[in-house]
Amino acid sequence: MNKDYQIFWPSPSDPVRFEVDTSHEKVESISESDTMNVSNLSQGIMLSDSPICMETTSTTCDLPQNEIKNFERENEYESTLCEDAYGTLDNLLNDNNIENYSKNVLTQPVDTISISSLRQFDTVCKFHCVEAFDDEMTEKPEFQSQVYNYAKDNNIKQDSFREENPMETSVSASTDQLGNEYFRQPPPRSPPLIHCSGETLKFPEKSLAKSTAKESALNPSQPPSFVCKTAVPSKEIQNYGEIPEMSVSYAKEVTAEGVERPEIVSTWSSAGISWRSKASQENCEMPDMEQSAESLQPVQEDMALNEILKKLKHTNRKQEARIQELQCSNLYLEKRVKELQMKTTKQQVFIDVIDKLKENVEELIEEKYKIILEKNDTKKTLQNLQEILANTQKHLQESRNDKEMLQLQFKKIKANYVRLQERYMTEMQQKNKSVSQYLEMDKTLSKKEEEVKRLQQLRKEQEKVTASALDLLKREKETQEQEFLSLQEEFQKRDKANLEERQKLKSRLEKLLTQVKNLQFMSENERAKNIKLQQQINEVKNENKKLKQHVARSEEQNYVPKSETAQLKEQLEEVMKSDITKDTKMTHSNLLLDCSPCEEESLNPADIERSSQLASKMHSLLALMVGLLKCQDITNSDAEHFKESEKVSDIMLQRLKSLHLKKKNLDKELLKHKDRITTFRDLIAKEKAFQDHAIKVTDCDSDEAKSIRDVPTFLGAKLDKYHSLNEELDFLITKLGCLLESKESHCNRLIEENDKYQRHLGSLIKKVTSYEEIIECADQRLAISHSQIAHLEKRNKHLEDLIRKPREKARKPRSKSLENHPKSMTMMPAVFKENRNDLD
């Protein structure tokens, strides 16, 4: 409620206090204690012991008795006006308001009546305190601020009381609104507010101001506009039917003065102080009036007569106003009778309400004892439930622990299952790879088996060729024997001619012996050289071993490139070729030296065998190196190996064919030369036998000697060719054997790897089956754990239902009793609430 009040506080010279309401809104409602105390207030105003009467008597002691009587009449009139105002308030309340009031009393608690009575007593005390403070306020203006603060505190208390008792404030608000409307409506002939002069000041104004101050003290919640609207005219009362405009003009003048001297105070304190100041002004002005009257009596008798006439007119007007006031008082008395009747009805209603409240209290006491019994029962049930809860909590903790253990086991099994799945996937991938490798190995094995079959067929063909060659050699041998017989015949014929030549040859033999000695010396030197060559060969073997080790390391590291392997092959071939050429030269030289026709010792077969052995060893070393390099090539790339092996096999077959042809030719020539050599040896032996018996031979043909010397050189050259061809054949045969051995070893390796893979597959299959069994066991455990969890959840639900049932049983009777008597909820003990919270 926003209200703007302009309070004009007059100076000591101003006789009247005015208040103007600028809000044009509704006034705040008065409290219920003021409405219930209307009758007491009206009686308190009439008492002579009250501070109002004391003040009036004190102020009127210096005045004449007529004016005192008039003042008492006006005071009674104002008290009746106040009673009329409060009576109209009570009459304006309808029966509906009474019914609402009775209902509100029924719904209120028992202590509200005592509180309202205390509030009534408090308001009366405040009224007397206000009247007592008014004198002090006039004498000591320092108390004005204290009174203002007290009014604020009183307003705050009433607001808090209204918040605590909204039902009472609603009833009082309705009555206050009606009362405010009544006081705002001016009477049909409201006395105007007239400017006060020092001559014509009378005390009804003061009494009316006092009554308004009392009303404002009784109703501190009312604004100052309420006081202004119920104010009585300040000086001589004119005709009530006339409404002069002086009040409005005077109000404007006062507003102007009030703006210059604004002093805002609370309603009841400002009223008391203003009327005290007015009384002091009147006391000061009365002796002045008497002096002026005494001085002007002899001089202005005419003026006195006029004044008497005016006074008579004024008294007439007063009488008319008095008649109207009496009529109003009659109406007020009628209303008062009705009000008393309503009060009696209200008292009966209150008695009925009190009886009902007593019955309710008895019922509440009975219910209290019932609730105490129920409380004991519930305590017992709660103890049982607590025991059950303790057991259930133990079971729940055990079940939770089991559940956690099962969850941990499940997580472990799940992790193991995931790992097994990953291993299974990796093993399946390895299995697929091994299967693909196994299929590839099968293909390579099948190809190699086909190659082996081809080589076996070639071997059989070679054996057939060798058999046919041997047959041819036998035939040639027979032919040579026949030729030998023919040659023997010719030799016998020539023996005779040779006898002559022997003598010539003896002389030449001596020369030849010297040459043979020289040749022996040369052969010894060459043998020393051969020993050195053997040492070099041993060094080469060591180097070959080192190279083999280096090749093995390179195979492990797979770091040796193909270009280096090719260079190593070429270097080894060059070295071996150089060694072979040296060996062949040495053998040729040995053969040439040993095959001298002069001495049998020159033809040493041990040297020939050694040279052949050395050549065969060198060929075998070369074959081993080639085989190693080819094995390396096989390990590096199988496809290249197969291609190279096919090419090599084709080339070798062609070479074998050509070598077989050459071998046949050489075998034929060898047989011939062997026969010739045997013949020459026989001749040499015969010549040695006949040396003792020989005669000096002088005649020897130089042509025959030359032919004899040329035969060993020719035979040596052919033997060299034959040896070289045999070495090449042996080299090719060893090479083919190495290839076959490498292929067989490779096939064996593949078979072993295949067996390993099959074993690995078997172990993998076993592992997979074992993993599947483990997974099945884990699934079974999971199913068991799920079933256990479901069983535990069912048990928990069952236990929760058991816990809820006694709660619901305890709540049902309470809800019924609370529906009938909501006040019984306050009797619930705190212990039961704590137990209930524990259960929750």
UniProtKB/Swiss-Prot annotation:
Q: Which PANTHER family match?
A: CANCER-ASSOCIATED GENE 1 PROTEIN
Q: Which Pfam families match?
A: CAGE1
Region named Disordered: 800-840
Organism classification = Eukaryota, Metazoa, Chordata, Craniata, Vertebrata
InterPro entries in the record: CAGE1_homolog, CAGE1_N
Q: Which organism is it from?
A: Macaca fascicularis (Crab-eating macaque)
Q: What is the name of this protein? A: Cancer-associated gene 1 protein homolog
Question: Any idea which UniProt keywords this protein has?
Answer: Coiled coil
Where would one find coiled-coil regions in this protein? Answer: 303-559
Instruction: Give the compositionally biased regions (Basic residues).
Output: 806-815
